[in-house]
Structure formats: structure tokens, C-alpha cells
């Protein structure tokens, strides 16, 4: 039911193209996943999201558990029907909330007790509970519960969190009983090569349908991000989809693809969109700036997204300056489409054996006959 098929390899790098087959369709890799934390990519309908070329989205177990609750989602027919998204969905386990809500939680080997950020009530999540929630949600891919420590933690503390993550993974594997849902394990270990290698080998030993690298892009220096991207792939199974969590910048995606990663997610395109910032090649345009007031060109003349086909920078500037919700939606749509387009261009370059680690498809010399 779940299969990862490698369709081409790059002779210049370790990049590859592939197809991840799921019960709700296939995901062509390399692929960027938009983030729909609460069962929605903020401000964007499922139909609009389809127009960007998105093939798989991410939702969050922790937040859906708090509201509206996994039982209600299950009663509706599952997460796909609930949000009217017929394509693959991956649910994050809530491990990131262990990190982001650190001041509101108490961690033990049994699980995490949170103070509900909505109403202050106590919520306990164990590995077993997290698996049950994701099975009830009915996502295509469920992530194992992990402990993501802050990047400032010392080596001993990160090793403790790593051992806890491994213990939780064993419990997740024992609990997960859904044949039409793939379970991915998560590698932790911070900036320490010894811990990353140990975690990669331990997680790979379970022979799960896919494997993820977590604890990246959580506030650390970009050099540390690149170090993990460069170091860890040699310890990962070749025949599994490799998911690098929390990465959404073009430079890091290009580097990660060159090292053999396949799937990425990040809130960046929609977060920037909600603040009026649009992607343009490898730049960011702040459409609030007065210089766009009389600019009647689209964000990107070469982009085929619904925003660029229909609206000017001047109109988007007007919407943003007046706090119109439509402006946030249109810019977010473009930003998602831009990242999907970028990974599509990478895929074409890999197939034509002209992909490089500093891939920049908007530069004619980089893409030969390819269009951008």
C-alpha cells in the first residue's frame, strides 16, 4: 500500500526523484508540503491549494486533539473528508510542541503533560495516545512522538531527550496498528554528530515506510543546519522517503535535495504571506512598501499561479496596506506555488542530469532549455 519508488538519480550529487505511493494518491519527490496545522493552510481553501500544485499537506496532531478533537474528525469520516482534501496528509506528532511550549509542559519517560494554551487545562500525551489520535484522524502518514529539545541544550540533555525519543518510538511501533497509515520515525540528536549517527541507525532499524530528521531549524545557526544536512544522509536507508522537517528556504531545500532528502515542510510561505511578503526568485518582496503602489506588474511574470495570472503588485499593495484578508490569501497562494514550482524545477533538472547544489532555475545558465 505504501511504496517509495526512486525514478532517477543525479550523477553530480546524491539527489534523486521518486514517487511515494499512498492510499490517497502519489507524492512526486522532491516535494514541499504546505503546513495546515489545524486542518487548514491559513486563509486558503482546499481548491485554491490544489491550484498551487500541492500534493501533500501537513496537519498537527496536538492542535487537532485540542480543537476540534480527533473523535469528531473520525465521526466526520476522517481528516480528508473533514477538510475536503482528497490527497495525502501527514500528521506531525506534537513533538515540536514539546519544544515550543516548553514553559507549559512537564516531560517524563511516560509522556508530556501540557498546560492547554487555550484554556489552561491539563493535557497528557503519551506515545500510545499520540498514535491513537493519529489513527482516529486517519492521515496517510503518522509521525512517531519525539522529544525535540532546544538547540541551546547541552550534549548530556540532548542525549537524554534522544534516548526518550527512542523509547517513545518503540512504544509507537508497538501501538500503531493501522495498515492504511504509514508510520515515520524521527531522528534527533541536535548538533552532535555522534548522537545524530546513533539516532539514525536506531530509527532505521525499525524498517518503517519512511524516516524523518527533526530538531532542525529550531533557532540554531544556519551553519549547524547545514552540518546536519551534510552529515546525516549517509546513515539513512536509500529506499525510504527522507523527510527533513521544518525547512522552507530555497537554499536549504537545494542543499538538502543534493544530499538525498525528498520531502520538506515549513510555515514560512504562509507566515510571510500574512505579513505581505512575497517570494520572487531568491528574493523577498515586502509588498507593503510604497514603491509597489504604482507597480502594475504581477509578483512574477513567469509564475503561472492564480495570483500572478490575475493581480498586480499595486493591487496587492493596496490590499495589504488596508489589512484586507484577500491580500494575505493571494500572497500566501503565490508563495506556496513558488516553492512547489522550485521543487518541480529541481526534479526536472535531476532527470536531465543538470542539477547542482546551488540550483537557481531563474538564472538562464542554470536551467539550459528549462522554463522557469
From Swiss-Prot:
State the GO CC annotations: cytosol
What is the UniProt remark on how the cofactor binds and its stoichiometry?
A: Binds 1 zinc ion per subunit.
**Subunit structure, per the record?**
Homodimer. Within each dimer, one monomer is responsible for RNA recognition and catalysis, while the other monomer binds to the replacement base PreQ1.
Start and end residues of each stretch annotated as RNA binding: 246-252, 270-274
Please state which protein family the record places this protein in.
Answer: Belongs to the queuine tRNA-ribosyltransferase family.
UniProt-annotated catalytic positions: 92, 265
The protein's annotated catalytic reaction(s) are: 7-aminomethyl-7-carbaguanine + guanosine(34) in tRNA = 7-aminomethyl-7-carbaguanosine(34) in tRNA + guanine
What Gene Ontology biological process does one annotation of this record name? tRNA wobble guanine modification
The protein's UniProt keywords, in alphabetical order, are: Glycosyltransferase, Metal-binding, Queuosine biosynthesis, Transferase, tRNA processing, Zinc
The source's domain of life comes to Bacteria
- Pfam families of this UniProt entry? TGT
Protein name per the record: Queuine tRNA-ribosyltransferase
- Where Zn(2+) binds, per the record, is at 303, 305, 308, 334
Matching SUPFAM superfamilies: tRNA-guanine transglycosylase
Pathway annotation from the record = tRNA modification; tRNA-queuosine biosynthesis
Top enzyme class: transferase
List residues binding substrate: 92-96, 146, 188, 215
Disulfide linkages recorded for this protein, renumbered to the chain, are none
User: NCBIfam families, from UniProt?
Assistant: Q_tRNA_tgt (TIGR00430), tgt_general (TIGR00449)
The UniProt function text for this chain reads: Catalyzes the base-exchange of a guanine (G) residue with the queuine precursor 7-aminomethyl-7-deazaguanine (PreQ1) at position 34 (anticodon wobble position) in tRNAs with GU(N) anticodons (tRNA-Asp, -Asn, -His and -Tyr). Catalysis occurs through a double-displacement mechanism. The nucleophile active site attacks the C1' of nucleotide 34 to detach the guanine base from the RNA, forming a covalent enzyme-RNA intermediate. The proton acceptor active site deprotonates the incoming PreQ1, allowing a nucleophilic attack on the C1' of the ribose to form the product.
Q: State the needed cofactors, names only.
A: Zn(2+)
Q: What is its EC number?
A: 2.4.2.29
Recorded GO molecular functions are: metal ion binding; tRNA-guanosine(34) queuine transglycosylase activity
Amino acid at each position: 500500500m505504501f511504496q517509495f519508488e526512486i525514478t532517477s538519480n543525479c550523477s553530480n550529487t546524491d539527489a534523486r526523484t521518486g514517487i511515494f505511493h499512498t492510499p490517497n494518491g502519489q507524492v512526486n519527490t522532491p516535494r514541499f508540503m504546505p503546513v495546515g496545522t489545524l486542518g487548514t493552510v491559513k486563509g486558503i481553501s482546499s481548491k485554491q491549494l490544489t491550484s498551487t500544485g500541492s500534493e501533500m499537506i501537513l496537519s498537527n496532531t496536538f492542535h487537532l486533539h485540542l480543537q476540534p478533537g480527533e473523535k469528531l474528525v473520525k465521526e466526520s469520516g476522517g481528516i480528508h473528508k473533514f477538510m475536503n482534501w482528497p490527497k495525502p496528509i501527514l500528521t506531525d506528532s506534537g513533538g515540536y510542541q514539546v519544544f515550543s511550549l516548553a514553559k507549559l509542559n512537564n516531560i517524563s519517560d511516560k509522556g508530556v503533560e501540557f498546560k492547554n494554551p487555550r484554556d489552561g487545562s491539563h493535557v497528557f500525551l503519551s506515545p500510545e495516545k499520540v498514535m491513537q489520535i493519529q489513527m482516529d484522524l486517519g492521515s496517510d502518514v503518522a509521525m512517531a512522538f519525539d522529544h525535540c529539545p532546544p538547540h541551546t541544550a547541552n550534549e548530556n540533555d540532548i542525549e537524554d531527550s534522544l534516548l526518550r525519543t527512542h523509547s517513545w518510538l518503540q512504544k509507537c511501533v508497538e501501538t500503531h496498528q493501522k495498515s492504511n497509515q504509514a508510520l515515520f520515525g524521527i531522528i534527533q540528536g541536535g548538533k552532535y554528530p555522534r548522537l545524530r549517527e546513533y539516532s539514525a541507525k536506531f530509527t532505521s532499524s525499525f524498517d518503517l515506510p519512511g524516516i524523518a530528521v527533526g530538531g532542525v531549524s529550531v533557532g540554531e545557526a544556519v551553519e549547524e543546519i547545514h552540518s546536519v544536512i551534510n552529515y546525516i544522509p549517509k546513515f539513512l536507508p536509500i529506499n525510504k522517503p527522507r523527510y527533513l522537517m521544518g525547512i522552507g528556504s530555497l537554499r536549504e531545500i537545494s542543499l538538502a535535495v543534493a544530499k538525498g532528502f525528498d520531502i520538506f515542510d515549513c510555515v514560512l510561505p504562509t507566515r510571510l504571506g500574512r505579513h505581505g511578503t512575497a517570494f520572487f526568485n531568491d528574493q523577498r518582496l515586502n509588498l507593503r512598501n510604497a514603491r509597489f503602489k504604482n507597480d502594475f506588474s504581477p509578483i512574477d511574470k513567469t509564475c503561472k499561479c492564480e495570483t500572478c495570472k490575475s493581480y498586480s503588485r499595486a493591487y496587492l499593495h493596496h490590499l495589504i496596506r488596508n489589512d484586507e484578508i484577500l491580500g494575505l490569501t493571494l500572497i500566501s497562494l503565490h508563495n506556496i506555488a513558488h516553492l512547489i514550482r522550485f521543487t518541480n524545477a529541481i526534479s526536472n533538472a535531476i532527470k536531465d542530469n543538470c542539477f547542482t547544489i546551488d540550483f537557481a532555475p531563474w538564472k538562464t545558465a542554470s536551467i539550459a532549455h528549462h522554463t522557469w
